[in-house]
Amino acid sequence: MYLIENLPPELWASAVPGVPRRTVRMIAAHIHNARCMWIKMMGATHGVAVLKTVDPRRVRAPELLRALSRSSDGIIKLLQIGIAQGGVVPRAAWQNFPNDVVHFLNYFVAHEAHHRGQLCMVARQLGQRLPGPVAAGLWQWSKRARE
């Protein structure tokens, strides 16, 4: 994940302003751990491998990057299952949105964009604003897709 790769390393253990019990590391780990939860609830019965979550208090950026790659593959498999089932993803026990592929994908886009925005804002609040090319690179979707 481009943003995680480009966060200043000194931010990793920094507390979130106004939420001192939460760190940059914890926000980043939450993205992977949330994916794992959905994969477990929706994909396990369809043969999608249930992944290990990461420790939000101890995970290092390289470990998280590897985990995010695996959980990305799991979410893609859930989308493929939904497409193969006529546009309907498997239902989760406490799902808070309709179980069509469009809503499922939009949920993940919104959830992950929210947390990426948090990471960018926290970096700025802590005086470690992302360099212009890095911030602009967040919007280079075609380039990111090729990476």
Could you tell me what each predicted segment is?
Residues 1-4, 11-54, 92-147:
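Short, contiguous alpha-helical
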Residues 6, 30-33, 70, 81:
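Residues within well-ordered alpha-helical secondary structure of globular protein domains
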Residues 10, 79-95:
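Acidic catalytic patch
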Residues 40-82:
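Helix-adjacent hinge/juxtasegments
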